[in-house]
Amino acid sequence: LKPVAIVNATSFSGRGVDGTSPLDATNAPVFQVALSTARVKDWKGAERGLSPADLAMHVVLPEVDGRLFAGIVSAKEPAKKDQDLEYARFEHTPIVDRIDRVVSRVDKWIALQNTSAPKTALILSTYPGKAYQIAHAVGLDAIQSCRAIVEDAGLGDPDALGDLGQRLQTEVLTWSVADYTAALDTVPSDLHAQLFEAWGDIAQDQYVQNGAFQFPALQLGNALIALQPERGWLKTRYDDYHDLSRTPCHGYVAFYLWLQSMNTDAMVHIGAHGTLEWLPGKSVALSNACWPDALAGDIPIIYPFIVNDPGEAAQAKRRISALTLGHIPPPLAQSHTPDAFVPLENLLDEFSNADGLDPKRRDRLMDQIRDLAQSLGVEQDLGIAGDVDQGEALTRIDRFVCDIKEAQFADGLHVFGRMGYEGDQSLAAHSERDGLRTALCGRRIASGP
């Protein structure tokens, strides 16, 4: 057999003691579906989507195997009562529209295998909304990573991007309100009602000018590069970002319907993290009445994500069926004692030497340390009251100075698929580049960070 894709409905992990799985033998991508043990009506009304047991069996453990979660396909309903047994057993009942979503989602991934030049949307975050932090991503230089992805995936000439950050603040691509209104017919009626109840007239949307939506975006070859629109108003951005209850505005909804209307082959969200996976809806096993499902549609989503944030990466995997590609964090630099704290550190060292050997000198040093710590504001920062025990105060001051001296911090930002600092990172850089190319070809990627 040479399948182009595998849809797996078995639960738990599919790996043996040697770490291999028969599902991986053909090197085809494996899509995991969930069979809920709840009744259909209970699933429809459940905010969590799946029970803890179903989540573990059908999502979490297959996720560790590297399966792409494609959605829920069935829940349970009582069968016809057996009159002899006086018992009606529960049977799995297909959820037809969710099966259709799984099929279309898998079809789009398969289509990538036969597309030499996929139309790819590269999406950059706008959080936290300051001009100097455009395209923010945790630990990732998203602007330079965008250039690298354009080059590595053969989407266009990265040099033609010029000053990408500046261009994204000045250039726009448009979509008419008329086309948007027509596309809204594809949005489930419940979501349609929520949208207009929350945001009213389309013409009043912040992204609408002269009868069209103005998206911060530009086209380069097969790549569409865009800033992810605001979920709501800029002034409420911080509150909106992780809010699972706020309905997105017309401009946000229009952006993703626009991508669907252009038959986008793949979407690459560059870096942790965006807002699509945080829209209202179920936590997992989404229905068609969940905003992430309606806006992501069946477009394959590839998501370079920092490896040390698996919790938020799981949100993208489970709510928008994203394939996350782990990237290494920036290198760590060693901190040092600030100049203003050097005299305090010296006094603490002297105190350690005098303690137990010269009580009079020790007491003088103790007073000097307290006085200096107070003048530097250290005691205030640590909440040390004036009447606190001297020994406790010195212990806390010493621990504070040591923590500062021994701390490590991120030095710069990582560029996806590149080695931008000293050290042998060639394996990680190669893995990132290869993972991106493989994903855009619709092929299987082995599990890993």
Regions found by a protein language model. Give the residues of each.
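Ligand/cofactor-recognition surfaces for anionic moieties
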Residues: 1-449
